[in-house]
A protein has these predicted regions:
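Acidic, glycine-rich active-site loops and adjacent beta-strand->loop/helix elements
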Residues: 17-21, 57-61, 150-151, 271-275
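Inter-helical turn/loop segments and adjacent helix faces that build the functional surface
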Residues: 20, 41-53, 72-77, 111-123, ...
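Domain-level cores of phosphate- or acyl-group-handling catalytic modules
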Residues: 21-100, 230-231
Length: 302
């Protein structure tokens, strides 16, 4: 993890450590180590390290985990330098939906040890959901990851290999599979929407951005040290890149358009429809130049 940060990556960690018992101290003491590592290791040469931890909503340590960024309480259980997200399952949300319709509905939620699968405690799903919403209002976190929905959207040529999504990245922008052989890697960039009118008519702009990101990914594959071999293997097999956006509010301000107006909504739709279409076209151009990624090629996808 520290090596990935030193190489310039923001890091997401799925914490599947078993709950506290006579052999394990649970999740929080280990997260304190990552919390300290944020200060001890830089992200490349630009800024301090930054990590995000993800925990399943049925983990026995979920309550302590949810509250780890609160400024008050036991400092041994606080990790203020570490970001965090909770993996919410369909089963959990069905309980919440049922409880919203019927206040007397049974919302019993089993917390299970991730290794033995033994039920450690039964709690109220409503109480956990309420805690999540309150903490998001107070601290802005935890991130919410609908993990079952993410896995349903995983391309079949990855899921057929037995690969599964266990969490997200530093800022919950992407969902890539991880395994004992793979540490997910994605090369990201953002388009500045403040200057949308300058580049949206340039047919080469987004394809060039995509080729640039793929070049950066290739540089990582060619130069990554052996200590991050799983990350290099994942990058080689999947060649994942991602394009986001920033500056939408600045664009609206420059046009004196209210952000909650119908016009702003229409502009937002037009911008992101354009980006989606151009990314699809850029993907085809990149594939014609360099061929499909190995995972897709193995699945017979041209």
């Amino acid at each position: 993890v520290n090596w990935l940060s030193m190489l310039g990556g923001g890091v997401g960690i799925h914490v599947d450590i078993r709950s506290a018992d006579d052999k394990s101290v649970g999740v929080m003491p280990h997260l304190k180590i990552y919390d300290a590592a944020c200060l001890a290791y830089r992200q490349g040469r630009t800024r301090r390290g930054s990590y995000a931890a993800f925990l399943d909503v049925d983990h026995p340590d979920i309550i302590q985990f949810l509250e780890m960024r609160k400024p008050t309480g036991d400092q041994n259980l606080r990790t203020l330098n570490l970001h965090h997200g909770v993996n919410i399952s369909d089963k959990f949300m069905r309980l919440i939906e049922k409880s919203m319709v019927n206040a007397d509905a049974d919302d019993s939620w089993e917390l299970r040890d991730p290794h033995s699968h033994r039920v450690v405690e039964v709690v109220s799903a409503r109480d956990i959901w309420q805690r999540i919403l309150e903490l998001r209002m107070q601290t802005g976190e935890p991130y919410i990851v609908f993990i079952d929905a993410a896995n349903r959207a995983l391309p079949s040529w990855l899921s057929d290999k037995g690969l599964k999504i266990h969490g997200s990245n530093l800022c919950t922008e992407i969902f890539l599979p991880t395994s004992e052989k793979r540490t997910a890697v994605c090369c990201l960039s953002s388009l500045n929407l403040e200057y949308f009118d300058h580049w949206n008519t340039n047919e080469q702009f987004i394809p060039d951005v995509m080729e640039f990101l793929d070049n950066v990914l290739q540089y990582f594959i060619d130069n990554a040290p052996n200590s991050v071999e799983r990350a290099r293997y994942s990058a080689l097999r999947e060649r994942s890149i991602g394009i986001g956006a920033l500056g939408f509010h600045a664009y609206l301000q420059s046009k004196r358009i209210p952000i909650e107006s119908v016009l702003a909504k229409s502009i937002n739709y037009r911008m992101f429809s354009h980006i989606k279409e151009e990314c699809a076209r850029g993907d085809e151009i990149l594939c014609e130049k360099r061929g499909p990624c190995p995972d897709a090629k193995d699945a017979g996808i041209p």
